[in-house]
Amino acid sequence: MTMAVAYFDSRKYHVVVLDSPGHKDFVPNIISGATQADAAQADVAILLIDASVGAFEAGMDGSKGQTKEHAQLIRSFGVDQIIVAVNKMDIVEYSKDRFDLIKQRLGTFLRSCGFKDSLVSWIPLSAMENQNLVAAPSDVRFSSW
């Protein structure tokens, strides 16, 4: 399994998108692909989090948590700024409590990796229901907070 790489330019930035599987067996591919795609010179990274109950916890598991490992890899590449995209909020009924729990637990870990709170952005979203993905959320359960 390889990592998908795509490039595009905005008015201000040259963007390199690396999409890699989250499974631990593919971590060497992440490292190899990131160095080949100049990700080690990135200004910002997006860390995609699964908000569903059990999935987030598995990613934070001390012995095999891929969320933790990916955050550490991002930081080891010298990336200071990170966007944490908390996806699948629809599965947890757009629970602000769930989002806040994820933000608190992961935020603590990100700080321990050297990320500064001022350079971490948190975005709750639901890709399946197109909520807060491209435009502001329309679902009242989500937009109310």
Residue ranges and their predicted role:
Residues 1-12:
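Switch I (effector-binding) loop of TRAFAC-class P-loop GTPase G-domains
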Residues 1-2, 21, 89, 128:
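Alpha-helical hydrophobic packing sites
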Residues 4, 27, 108:
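Eukaryotic intrinsically disordered and solvent-exposed regulatory patches
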Residues 12-16, 20-27, 36-100:
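Conserved Switch II/interswitch segment of TRAFAC-class P-loop GTPases
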Residues 30:
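Active-site-proximal loop/helix segments of hydrolase catalytic cores
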Residues 33, 73, 108-112:
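A generic secondary-structure signal
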Residues 80-83, 91-145:
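Canonical P-loop GTPase G-domain recognition
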